[in-house]
Regions:
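G-domain G4 guanine-recognition motif of GTPases
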Residues: 5-13
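Zinc-dependent deaminase catalytic domain
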Residues: 13-174
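Phosphate/Mg2+-binding loops and adjacent switch elements
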Residues: 1-3
């Protein structure tokens, strides 16, 4: 996780020292934490950055914050599967190969023979030889699907976008 992010929003900066001022600000924060408070935007970005740690997605973790015009936080979201579904970081190869639980895996994953054959071919040796030494191995549906189809498309993710999740929080809780 990055702790420092410098951004120069000015394209035609006449103020020569804008970036220098930001560097001084962060050095001050390092040497004397709490002396300089973060800007409203920095505070919201830090919240979004921390929110992404809740993501159940293996391939991409994203956080989002919705604020009003005064930067008062109204909702926080992160990319994860829809309510009631099991996130990819909790779905394991062992469970897929040995169980194929309908509550955990999609109808496509359970019934599509091409997908099932790919999973057995790719992971059966790993499971049978106990290469993982008892550790669990999660898998990303999108990555496996892209490998089968040869597509580079990101469309086949199971996760809701972080922004979508934040908007759903507003709708659900006000």
């Amino acid at each position: 996780l990055a702790d420092i992010y410098l951004y120069n929003p000015r394209e035609n900066t006449k103020e020569k020292y804008f970036i220098s001022e930001l560097v001084v600000k962060y050095i001050t924060l390092i040497k004397h934490p709490g002396l300089v408070t973060p800007s409203s935007v920095e505070r919201c970005m830090q919240i979004a950055y921390n929110a992404k740690l809740n993501s159940g997605c293996l391939s991409r973790q994203v956080g989002a914050v919705i604020t009003d015009e005064n930067y008062s936080v109204k909702a926080v979201g992160w990319n994860s599967v829809a309510e009631g579904q099991v996130p990819c970081n909790l779905r394991t190869i062992n469970n897929y190969l040995n169980n194929k639980d309908e509550d955990t895996f999609s109808t496509f994953e359970i019934e599509n023979t091409q997908f099932s054959d790919h999973m057995y071919k790719t992971y059966d040796d790993v499971i049978n030889k106990d290469v993982l030494n008892g550790r669990l191995c999660a898998y990303c549906f999108k990555d496996e699907y892209k490998e089968i189809t040869g597509e580079k498309n990101q469309v086949h993710t199971r996760s809701l976008h972080a922004e979508e999740n934040a908007f759903l929080q507003i709708v659900k809780y006000g």
